[in-house]
Amino acid sequence: VAMETGQIEENTGDRLIRPEWNINGMSPAPGVAHTQYATPLPQLLKDAGYFTIHVGKAHWASAGTPGASPYNMGFVVNVSGNVAGMPRSYQSEENYGNTPEKWNMLAVQNMTEYYGTGVHLTEALTREALKTLEYPIRHGEPFFLYMAHYATHTPIQPDKRFIQKYLDAGMDKGQARYASMVEGVDK
């Protein structure tokens, strides 16, 4: 919320827990109970002619409020962002938490081309972010890319590209999993 409004974090009162608790994120629309009303930065940039792109975690407001949707916040493109603050899975072998049985809010959406490929969610989101830049660059448009990796939020699941070197360095499995996730973001 602080990033989206320009306010100091402690001044927003944001707690993002449940809609009936005060305060739960921001709202781009006035009059929404228990939210911080403000015009979000992406909306201001969009209004100024920027092509606005969101990729990854979009945890600005509680489910069911206007601020829960990146589109309502002023983004033209949204890649896998919803109200969830964490993914159900970082692993493509687990379809990033998507199952055929039922919908799950924590399942990362719109990443089917990576299912079963062995690509960690962090890398998949990075690849998608790069793809979204093709349009504004090709058309000479100014752009704003808000890249918000889910890592290193729980569940702590290894980025297989990097974990072995941490195990070889003597880290326990938990530390190695976490370190591999950090390196995946830094890559």
Spell out what each predicted region is.
Residues P87-Y90, R161-V185:
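Extended hydrophobic/aromatic segments used for targeting, binding, or gating
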Residues R15-F51, A58-F143, H149-P158, L167:
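Formylglycine-dependent
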Residues E9-E10, T52, V77, K173:
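Residue-level detector of short coil/turn "hinge" positions at structural boundaries
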Residues V1-L16:
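Active-site nucleophile/metal-coordination loop of metallo-enzymes that catalyze phosphate/sulfate
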